[in-house]
Amino acid sequence: MTDKLQPLRGMKDLLPDDYKVHDYIIKKAKEVGELYGYKQMSTPILEYTKVFNRSMGESSDVISKEIYSFLDKSDESVALRPEFTAGIVRAFISNGLQHKLPLKLFSTGPVFRYDRPQAGRQRQFHQLNYEYLGAKGAISDAETLKLAVDILQSLEVLADTTLELNSLGCSQSRSTYQQKLVEYLNDFKDELSEDSKIRLTKNPMRILDSKSEVDQKIVANAPVLSEYYTEESKKYFEELLKYLDILGVKYTINARLVRGLDYYCHTAFEFTTTKLGSQSTILAGGRYDGLSRIMGNNDEIPAIGFAAGIERIALMREYNIDSVTPIFVLPIGENNISHSLKIADQLRLHNIPVLIEVSGKMAKRMQRALNENAKFIVFIGDEEQANNNLKIKDLEKQEEYILDFSKTIELLKKS
């Protein structure tokens, strides 16, 4: 007996009902983004692995443990994208879009990470992604955070989230802080997890993000970044908070919220929820002024962005989305199939969704119409074809009509 074929572990089929919810989430998010001037673009799912090595760092968990990377037939190392930002910045540089700044860009699609599958975390998942390239100053950060708030509000999940906010300060602030953090962590070097022992020499701030309980206990008493802000960093953060207050954005300052990559600066944020267990983050982002230069651009481009998990948003509430209700055309007898096909085509030309059922007993075909929640059935038999009219059954009112084609269009459109 042949084994039943299954999808890869951590990769799920999106069936029509799932896709309906995904489509709705994307549509609402795109509409809100357009109010802020965002335009949609897409990048390839496959990139050269070095695109992500440069942007995320070879010592990051994503690159060292989670990326789907392999040699193609030309012996080039390529990777399935684990996130959008690197590809967007690569596209900005390779397409020479510097003269079009500022740019507000929206993307959506699948991303891939080889992680342990669980509720709200799969190996293939889908994201909404927003990047604001050429975003100068705290006012751009505040606008970006308000965009995130408005998206979650439009999707009716904002009330179940908390905006956690922090400032990573400028490069000088982070450099001073990193020295103090290393001094503190060196006293616990032998107790750190194996991953964090490596991070201690390569990127110690990543230890603050560690999921290890042992590491978390150690960093609970570590120095706090805000103690080492320069005056510039303090002013930037204070300005951001002022703008958020003006916009009515509620937030909680989380001094332990960091980004472990060198190109991140100033604003870092996450929208978290208690409704999804351990997978509590549904949207996260930050300012990344240094990334464009790391990716090969001559100048540093100020930028901020965020990504939201579509599957996680979908898990937060049940969306009751109206489906397109089709009209069913049912020919009575084989000699009426050709005419029924023509009628169905003419109805579609008037933007009326139509399904035509030609095989099986009439009772089964009518049952299919009921299963699809059809409001009307159009019967076409010898008499209807001869008289050039249609027999319409209204399934809600349980009434029948004999109408010509133009009157049929009027009835179907007003219903």
Curated annotation (Swiss-Prot):
Which reaction is recorded as catalysed by this protein? tRNA(His) + L-histidine + ATP = L-histidyl-tRNA(His) + AMP + diphosphate + H(+)
Keyword vocabulary terms for this entry: Aminoacyl-tRNA synthetase, ATP-binding, Cytoplasm, Ligase, Nucleotide-binding, Protein biosynthesis
Q: Which GO molecular function entries does the Swiss-Prot or TrEMBL record give?
A: ATP binding; histidine-tRNA ligase activity
Q: Which PROSITE patterns does the record associate with it?
A: AA_TRNA_LIGASE_II
Cellular-component GO terms for this entry: cytoplasm
List where in the cell it is found: Cytoplasm
Where do the TM regions start and end?
Answer: none
Q: Does the keyword NAD apply?
A: no
UniProt keyword annotation of Oxidoreductase present? no
Q: Name one Pfam family in it.
A: tRNA-synt_His
Q: What is its EC number?
A: 6.1.1.21
Write out the GO biological process terms: histidyl-tRNA aminoacylation
Protein family per UniProt: Belongs to the class-II aminoacyl-tRNA synthetase family.
Summary of subunit composition and partner proteins: Homodimer.
Question: HAMAP family annotated for this entry?
Answer: His_tRNA_synth
- Write the protein's name: Histidine--tRNA ligase
Q: Which species is the source of this protein?
A: Rickettsia bellii (strain OSU 85-389)
